[in-house]
A protein has these predicted regions:
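Conserved catalytic core of the tyrosine transesterase superfamily
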Residues: 160-174
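N-terminal core-binding DNA-recognition domain of tyrosine recombinases/integrases
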Residues: 1-4, 13-143, 158-161
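Catalytic-site neighborhood detector that most strongly recognizes the C-terminal catalytic loop/helix
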Residues: 205-207, 243-246, 309-335
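Conserved tyrosine-mediated DNA breakage-rejoining catalytic core shared by Y-recombinases
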Residues: 135-136, 179, 188-227
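A short, basic/aromatic helix-end/turn motif that makes direct DNA contacts
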Residues: 188-194, 296-298, 306-313, 320-324
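DNA/chromatin major-groove-contacting recognition/catalytic segments
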Residues: 154-155, 214-224, 228, 319-337
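Short, basic (Lys/Arg/His-rich) helix/loop patches that form interaction surfaces
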Residues: 161-163, 231-236, 251-307, 311
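Short, charged phosphate-coordinating catalytic segments
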Residues: 117-129, 176-198
Length: 337
């Protein structure tokens, strides 16, 4: 089992432990979640539990002390006291409080549980399959939101010298836009990853299932960003921060660069389309989408783009990038004149 799959199953295991403790505290003191008693009704309860763990946390915070919502290992950075995280109303968010899960995330967790149940049946641990009479919600994605090369350059050229931390995370984001890797692979890059003018890495997500080396040539901008932060005593390619802080600083950098065009995104909790300014939806994964989207617009060859992004041949991910962009739409309408 790959490292990423193992991590995902550990997340599921903690969720099920918390659900079991919740049931015990909510009136069923002798409740025990087993392969034998798992039923469609229990699956519906688990689905509801996964959808809104925040409410459970506020009622029974002790459950989350025993089985934390998150067990992330942060990138090592100098210790300093961080300001508390505030919600939209300015109230301090209790440490360890779960974030609302989207329907895709809940469906993904239930799909992993179903895979485990089917494995248990195949290996003789149970004959009970509650998923025969339980339907997992469909995983739905919206159109990928990414920035144009012009917007990326505007972001890079924005003067952020008054806030070095935002400037640094902005520069890392732009570098990620130029190499297209996932943030987990970015954080593992060192100076040894640079070979003959290109960055080489084995995507962590597919390392054990399909260990291929991805090689992405570095353009002048990428090489200048590496040189700007060159520090061989650090070993890591850039002064990385936690992914949470990285995403927070990216949003600030976008806003300061005036990247505020309105985009339509899919609210994963309600599955409704909502309009939001670009800087609000900016995140580390937008860098990967930017790399893929801008190249795919030019070549329209998923296998060629996949050789640079690490996607396997025939990946369904590229189907989401096939929407005709605005410039092409205008050109097509021009044919009617």
């Amino acid at each position: 089992m790959s490292e990423q799959r193992l991590k995902n199953f550990k997340v599921l295991t903690r969720c099920l432990h918390r659900f079991e403790l919740f049931k015990k505290k909510d009136g069923s003191r002798v409740f025990s979640l087993t392969l034998a008693n798992l039923s469609p009704e229990l699956l519906r309860q688990i689905e509801d539990f996964l959808t809104d763990e925040k409410a459970i946390f506020l009622r029974y915070p002790e459950i989350y002390e025993q089985f934390p919502y998150s067990a992330k290992i942060a990138v090592k950075t100098p210790k300093r006291k961080r300001p508390p995280i505030l919600d939209d109303e300015g109230n301090e968010v209790p440490k360890g409080m779960p974030k609302p899960r989207g329907q895709n995330t809940v469906a993904d967790l239930l799909t992993r549980l179903r895979a485990f149940i089917l494995w248990a049946i195949d290996n003789g641990y149970t004959t009970n399959n509650p998923f025969k009479h339980f339907s997992i919600g469909e995983i739905v994605y919206g159109t990928p939101i990414y920035i144009s090369n012009e917007e990326r350059n505007k972001l890079l050229e924005t003067d952020l010298s008054d806030d070095k931390e935002v400037e640094t995370q902005r520069d890392i984001f732009v570098f990620q836009c130029l190499v297209g890797c996932r943030v987990s692979d970015l954080y593992k890059m060192t100076y040894r990853s640079i070979i003959n003018g290109a960055v080489e890495y084995i995507p962590r997500k597919t390392k054990e299932d399909r260990p291929i080396t991805v090689r992405v040539p570095l353009n002048d901008t990428a090489l200048k960003l590496i040189a700007k932060y060159q520090d061989y005593s650090r070993d890591m390619l850039f002064p990385f921060n936690t992914e949470q802080n990285y995403n927070r600083k990216i949003k600030i950098a976008f806003q300061r660069a005036g990247l505020d065009r309105i985009v339509t995104v899919l609210d994963q909790q309600t599955r409704q389309e909502v309009q939001r300014p670009l800087y609000e939806v900016a995140s580390s994964h937008m860098a990967r989408r930017t790399f893929i989207g801008n190249i795919y617009k030019k070549v329209k060859d998923p296998n060629l783009v996949g050789a640079l992004s690490g996607h396997k041949e025939g990946s369904k991910a590229f189907a989401r990038y096939r929407d005709i962009d605005e410039e092409m739409k205008k050109e097509l309408i021009g044919f009617l004149d």
